[in-house]
Amino acid sequence: MPPKEKDVLVTELESLIEHLSDDNFASSFHFSDELLSLNDLKLLTKKPMFIIANINDKTDENEVLEFQKKISDNIHLVTIDVKLEQDISDLDPNDQADFMDEMGIKESALTRIIRKGYELLGLKTFFTSGPKETRAWAAKKDFNARECSGIIHTDIQKGFIRAETVSYSDYIDNDGEQGSKNSGVWRQEGKDYMVQEGDVIYFRFNI
């Protein structure tokens, strides 16, 4: 590295150290391309982060907003009522949905936490389903069909022919694969197809 570039990098590193010394997160620091290229930094507070805050029915909404203002703009907040979630889990599974509807709860805290984690990591979920098993797979949001097939096995990616797919909602509404085919919602897609959140996929391949 030329001396001039080295001096610039040293100056930026000193600025970063000062930023961190003031109790700031690395995620709120403006990184130059040169600084980002230093893989050895491995700064923990630069990683995607969210805070889970336990609240209850007496929690003042303004307190939550004030807390949100105090943390970095790059850190997200998920609020959950642990006691309420415990009460829901203690109910009979058949009664849980009715209770959640009555309380105006659209999804469980666990679902919201997982969704936020996926959002921050830039992930999406697709499914494979067969006679013995239905399985969820995590993939990067920008992965196409061929790249997603490689998550299951590299041989599938190497011998990729096509992806047969249907949305999760259509799959459920039509009672599975055969019903989806009969209804005309079962599609055939090529290797560049951008897999959508919740797609149910059957990968055709040859090795």
Model-derived features with residue positions:
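C-terminal-of-GTPase-core extension/linker across diverse P-loop GTPases
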Residues: 1-197, 201, 206-207
